[in-house]
Amino acid sequence: MSQSIKLFSVLSDQFQNNPYAYFSQLREEDPVHYEESIDSYFISRYHDVRYILQHPDIFTTKSLVERAEPVMRGPVLAQMHGKEHSAKRRIVVRSFIGDALDHLSPLIKQNAENLLAPYLERGKSDLVNDFGKTFAVCVTMDMLGLDKRDHEKISEWHSGVADFITSISQSPEARAHSLWCSEQLSQYLMPVIKERRVNPGSDLISILCTSEYEGMALSDKDILALILNVLLAATEPADKTLALMIYHLLNNPEQMNDVLADRSLVPRAIAETLRYKPPVQLIPRQLSQDTVVGGMEIKKDTIVFCMIGAANRDPEAFEQPDVFNIHREDLGIKSAFSGAARHLAFGSGIHNCVGAAFAKNEIEIVANIVLDKMRNIRLEEDFCYAESGLYTRGPVSLLVAFDGA
């Protein structure tokens, strides 16, 4: 790049076309990159990003009041602190571990097999648009105990809500659509909440309806916000991670052969995908006080964006970080799906992703089904791979061919 990285905008189309081409220069020359148009900083070095995420007293989630609450209908888990955060996080976690996870595994398998079935005889599919997006929504609806016949409208409304949260800026028309989608979800979910209070089952909404915080039942508003929180967090990254993993395994045939021969390597492939191409690229924080980041003094109330993709490619944290390698010794596989993960795809600190273990289980199950059912899987001839997204990022499509059933 001939132009100074300090004069370059990470909000430009040029950057969004391939952000990975600029991460190294950002880390080396401008690790605390200022974007004047939004008066915010973008932080790219691993140790700076990890420090920010692990110090919520200084780097707060206050910005989510504007970035999330209008469409989430209330505070999300990442905004909560102390006893409230611990208690409500524990309630949600109950649906992602132990017996609850065992209960969800057959549903994950059933969704994957049912959605793949129409494509198996054809011998080709788009793993993003034919399968992944619908799969992620259907699994989340099963977890919540919602009627999957409504998955198309839930998917549409979810997309509108996600656009609000993951857009650096929105047009008035796009903002109005996002708020409308949030209202539609609210109208859809409120009767479900009231019904589950009377007739609870084993689903997450029932768990929320029958749980207490400080001796009191959660309000309908609290439950609605937590449902929307789960819907967004469980759906948005899942389809992207699966498609990214399959694509990079296909581009590294020796590693694909290793995985096909030894399925115990699938968790390594998932973890390396999360490091190499994290679906969540940006995590915002707002300063509670003047502080110094990477040698730069930043004023109170300023918003900083942690660049997860750039941090996960930092050579100070990982050897040969720009190489996809499921066998890397510094992957930290034992903790890769927890708050102690070396990679930062799940965040870090007290606000790390509550569903990390569930995400691993979900993607491992569906990846094995894809590899079993789609024998001799390969990219379609003349397929042109592309990714999109600044805040969250994943393949636009993934056209694969395979030996039909």
From Swiss-Prot:
UniProt GO molecular function: heme binding; iron ion binding; monooxygenase activity; oxidoreductase activity, acting on paired donors, with incorporation or reduction of molecular oxygen, reduced iron-sulfur protein as one donor, and incorporation of one atom of oxygen
Pfam families: p450
Domain of life: Bacteria
GO BP term (any one): pigment biosynthetic process
Gene3D superfamilies the UniProt entry points to: Cytochrome P450 (1.10.630.10)
UniProt cofactor(s): heme
EC number: 1.14.15.13
Catalyzed reactions: cyclo(L-leucyl-L-leucyl) + 6 reduced [2Fe-2S]-[ferredoxin] + 3 O2 + 4 H(+) = pulcherriminic acid + 6 oxidized [2Fe-2S]-[ferredoxin] + 4 H2O
Residues bound to heme: 62, 229, 285, 353
UniProt KW keywords: Heme, Iron, Metal-binding, Monooxygenase, Oxidoreductase
Presence of keyword Oxidoreductase: yes
Protein family per UniProt: Belongs to the cytochrome P450 family.
Oligomer status and interactors: Homodimer.
Function: Involved in the biosynthesis of pulcherrimin, a red extracellular pigment. Catalyzes the oxidation of cyclo(L-Leu-L-Leu) (cLL) to yield pulcherriminic acid which forms pulcherrimin via a nonenzymic reaction with Fe(3+). Substrates with small alkyl groups (cAA, cLG, cLP) exhibit weaker binding to CYP134A1, but substrates with larger hydrophobic side chains bind in a similar regime to cLL.
Protein name, per record: Pulcherriminic acid synthase
Organism this protein belongs to: Bacillus subtilis (strain 168)
Gene, per the UniProt record: cypX
